[in-house]
C-alpha cells in the first residue's frame, strides 16, 4: 500500500489532528458499547506517548448538520477517554478558529457534523480543520468511504497527511481476503434487503466458493425460486436480480445454499411464539424470522470446511431470543474455525458482542459501509487522497 504511516513521522512537539470513528451508541448519556473506542485508543495513546499535542475529531450519530443537539454530543466520549488515558483530556466545543493544546495533552473536539459543510466537503471548513495541525492522521476506517471535510478535505490541505495504525490494520485485513485468500472461501451475507447489498452479492459470486444469504436477503432468493414465504420480508422488485445472481453463481462455480427449514412466527415481536417448519410447510400468514436446525447444521458444516470466512449480517432476527439460534450457531462456528475470519457491519458486531466472541474472530472491522465498499472492490476516497499525498511527498 502506497501510504505514509503515522509511525513513519516524528510527532514530537507537533500538533497532530486524528480523525477517529468514535460513533458509539449512547443511551441516557451512557456509552452502551465501547468497541470503537477500544479500537481507537492505541492510536491516540501512541501519538501522546510520542510527545504530540493531540486533537481528535469524530462524528456521532446523524444530527441535522450545522445544528447542535445534546444527544449527539461527543462529551460522553471525552469523559470515557479521560478515564482510559493517563494524559490530560479536554473537551472543546468551538475549535474552528484554533485550539490551544500542548504536547502530552488531548483535546476532543465536538461532533464534526455540527459544522455546516461537513458532509459536502466544504473547502473553507476543510481548510480550517487543516489549520489546526502540523500532521493529519486519518484513522477512521468506518468513514473512509465518505469524501467529507473531516475525512477527505482536511487531508488535501493539511501540511502532512498520513494513515493511522487502525486504518492500516483494517486495510491489511481486507487485503488478506481480497488479494490472496486461502480457499475455500465462505461468505455469509445477511440483513434485510438485497438492494443494499446488490453490488456486494454480485462481486462475491465471482470471488467466493460458497455464498450463504441470510435474513430478508435469503427470503428474496427463496421467493425468486418459487417458494412460499408467507408474509416474510422480501423485495418483490428484485426477484429478477436474485435469479440473475443465482445464474451468475452457477456460471462462476459459486454455491448459494438456501434454507431447507425455517423458524416462523405470526408477528414481528419479542413475545411471538416460534415454530420450526420445513420450507414446504410455510403458511400464507407465516413470517420467516430465522433458519431452522437442519439448515443450521448444513451451514455450520460449510463454515467448518472454509479456510477464509467473510461475515456481514445476521441470518435471523437475533434481537429476539426465540429467533436467535441461527445467528448464534453461525457466529460460534466462525469463532471455532481455524480459518482466517473477518466480520464487519453494525448488526454483525452487535452479534459478536452479544455472544462474547470478540477474541475468537480473526479480524473485526469497525466499518459498515466502508467494509462493504472494500469488499465490492471500490476505492475509498479518504484512502485515495492519502495515497495521492504520499505520491506527492515521494516526488519532492
From Swiss-Prot:
Biochemical pathway: Carbohydrate degradation; glycolysis; pyruvate from D-glyceraldehyde 3-phosphate: step 2/5
Residue ranges of the TM segments: none
One cellular-component annotation, GO: cytosol
InterPro entries found in the cross-reference section: Phosphoglycerate_kinase, Phosphoglycerate_kinase_CS, Phosphoglycerate_kinase_N, Phosphoglycerate_kinase_sf
Keyword ATP-binding among record annotations: yes
Entries under Gene3D superfamilies matching the protein: Phosphoglycerate kinase, N-terminal domain (3.40.50.1260)
GO molecular function annotation: ADP binding; ATP binding; phosphoglycerate kinase activity
E.C. numbers: 2.7.2.3
Pfam families (UniProt xref): PGK (PF00162)
Protein's cellular compartments: Cytoplasm
Reaction catalysed by this enzyme: (2R)-3-phosphoglycerate + ATP = (2R)-3-phospho-glyceroyl phosphate + ADP
Cited HAMAP family: Phosphoglyc_kinase (MF_00145)
Protein's name according to its UniProt entry: Phosphoglycerate kinase
Organism: Legionella pneumophila (strain Paris)
